Amino acid sequence: MQQGWLSNWLVKHEVVHRSLGFDHRGIETLQIKAEDWDSIAVILYVYGYNYLRSQCAYDVAPGGSLASVYHLTRIQYGIDNPEEVCIKVFAQKDNPRIPSVFWIWRSSDFQERESFDMVGISYDNHPRLKRILMPESWIGWPLRKDYITPNFYEIQDAH
């Protein structure tokens, strides 16, 4: 499998990762261990990836792991030719913990909160990690594949 510049750089500096190749738009995708995410995030920011385009999370498989996905952009040579990279950080479903990157990219605030709320990934050192879409009293994480839908929903006044 062909590796991009980031994967080659990480190999050169002995940072453990797994190259997942390139997507249909030619964007390099890497799998990173949760314990390495802090240092790799700093490396990417210093290199110029100062824009977090999006962050999302998904359930890989029932009983399997959860993934937090970060799409980062670096605009160096003009807006028409941005460099992008996709980082996937996996966590075990029994204790899904991933370091928050709020202190690097402030735009991750609501995105990490939504991932916590819908999938149940805890983002360590996030300053306001609480539910953002579901009521605080909600039990479970609705976007997990093993989620059991309640038999009833309490209708709440929006005011």
UniProtKB/Swiss-Prot annotation:
Reactions mediated catalytically: a plastoquinone + NADH + (n+1) H(+)(in) = a plastoquinol + NAD(+) + n H(+)(out); a plastoquinone + NADPH + (n+1) H(+)(in) = a plastoquinol + NADP(+) + n H(+)(out)
Protein keywords: Chloroplast, Membrane, NAD, NADP, Plastid, Plastoquinone, Quinone, Thylakoid, Translocase, Transport
Pfam entry (one): Complex1_30kDa
GO annotation, biological process: photosynthesis, light reaction
GO molecular function: NADH dehydrogenase (ubiquinone) activity; quinone binding
NCBIfam families the UniProt entry points to: PRK12494.1
HAMAP family, per the entry: NDH1_NuoC (MF_01357)
Protein family (similarity comment): Belongs to the complex I 30 kDa subunit family.
Name of the featured protein: NAD(P)H-quinone oxidoreductase subunit J, chloroplastic
Organism: Oryza sativa subsp. indica
